[in-house]
UniProtKB/Swiss-Prot annotation:
Pfam families assigned: WD40
Protein keywords: Cytoplasmic vesicle, Endoplasmic reticulum, ER-Golgi transport, Membrane, mRNA transport, Nuclear pore complex, Nucleus, Protein transport, Repeat, Translocation, Transport, WD repeat
SMART domains linked: WD40
WD repeats: from-to residues: 1-36, 41-82, 87-128, 132-186, 195-237, 244-283
Gene, per the UniProt record: SEC13
InterPro entries in the record: G-protein_beta_WD-40_rep, Sec13/Seh1_fam, WD40/YVTN_repeat-like_dom_sf, WD40_repeat_dom_sf, WD40_rpt
Subcellular location: Cytoplasmic vesicle, COPII-coated vesicle membrane; Endoplasmic reticulum membrane; Nucleus, Nuclear pore complex
Protein name: Protein transport protein SEC13
GO biological process: COPII-coated vesicle budding; ERAD pathway; mRNA transport; nuclear pore localization; positive regulation of DNA-templated transcription; positive regulation of ER to Golgi vesicle-mediated transport; positive regulation of protein exit from endoplasmic reticulum; positive regulation of TORC1 signaling
The keyword Disulfide bond is assigned to this record: no
Organism: Pyricularia oryzae (strain 70-15 / ATCC MYA-4617 / FGSC 8958) (Rice blast fungus)
CDD domains linked to this entry: WD40
GO molecular function: structural molecule activity
GO cellular component term of the entry, any: GATOR2 complex
Membrane-topology descriptor: Peripheral membrane protein
Length: 289
């Protein structure tokens, strides 16, 4: 079974991972594709693959049931595993690279309840690991590097923020940000978001940098929630239920512009949602397998 499939920044390479413990790299040209590499090393199913921004080179991260995170790099047409992390005691469910403006940072979410953040610089990695959700972490998503509202602010350009959201088996979302004074990631004040009645399976922070921040969450309680926070009142989050679906909702994903949300549910359907001028969310398309 293939668990993840991700195109690189330019859409020319596709990485997939599966239950057979392998990662496959395909070259994509038009409507054709060609297998160019099979990467091995994980000792269990591989759940997730993620491409780093190309400014850092051809770098791919992978995570799996074996609790390991691998960093792979292509040089001279050959792929090599350059880092092998065993920071977790249970399955690492997802890995996510930060916006490149924030640095070369990789957040890893594990069933052991911890999140690790790896920072790559000068050909070495530093890491921080902290308890996020005691019953397990299922998902993680970075905020845009630019704070909401800042692009229309008259103030000087702020430093890129390091901020992300996690979703856990304790039915909550949590907002984390880098605290320079303590050199640690801390849960923000007002950053524990409650509303779901079952596991939060996926979260996605919208890339929009307008007046509001948007986070979408998918849950085993069969709902998708949209969480919003206005730049004029940071730290205060409000949520509304997008819809109660007939089955578990597995994944949510924003478009690059941040105005369309794709929802994948257990009935083999993908629905696309958009907010109208009244602030109401409506389904604009439905795709069925």
């Amino acid at each position: 079974m293939i668990h993840d499939a991700v195109l690189d920044y330019y859409g020319r390479r596709l990485a997939t991972c599966s239950s057979d413990r392998t990662i496959k790299i395909f070259e994509v040209e038009g409507e054709t594709h060609r297998l160019t590499e099979t990467l091995k090393g994980h000792e269990g199913a591989v759940w997730c693959v993620a491409w780093a921004h190309p400014k850092y080179g051809n770098i791919l991260a992978s995570s799996g049931y074996d609790g390991k995170v691998f960093i792979w790099r292509e040089q001279g047409g050959a792929w090599q595993k350059i880092f092998d992390f065993a920071l977790h005691k249970a399955s690492v469910n997802i890995v996510s690279w930060s916006p490149h403006e924030s640095g070369c940072l990789l957040a890893c979410a594990s069933s052991d309840g911890h999140v690790s953040v790896l920072e790559f610089k000068d050909n070495s990695f530093d890491h921080q690991t902290f308890l996020a959700h005691g019953q397990g972490v299922n998902s993680v998503s970075w905020a845009p590097s630019t704070a909401p509202g800042s692009i229309i602010s008259t103030n000087a350009t702020p430093a890129a923020q390091r901020r992300f959201v996690t979703g856990g088996s304790d039915n909550t979302l949590k907002i984390w940000s880098w605290d320079a004074a303590s050199a640690q990631y801390r849960c923000e004040e007002g950053g524990v978001l409650s509303g779901h009645t079952d596991w939060v399976l996926d979260v996605d922070w919208s890339p929009t940098v307008l007046q509001k921040s948007y986070i979408a969450s998918a849950s085993q309680d069969r709902t998708v929630r949209i969480w919003t926070s206005d730049s004029s009142n940071p730290g205060v989050w409000q949520s509304r239920v997008l819809k109660e679906f007939d089955t578990t909702v597995w994944r949510v994903s924003w478009s690059l512009s941040g105005n369309v949300l794709a929802v994948s549910s257990g009935d083999n359907k993908v629905t696309l949602w958009k907010e109208n001028l009244k602030g109401e969310w409506a389904c604009v398309n439905s795709l069925e397998d």
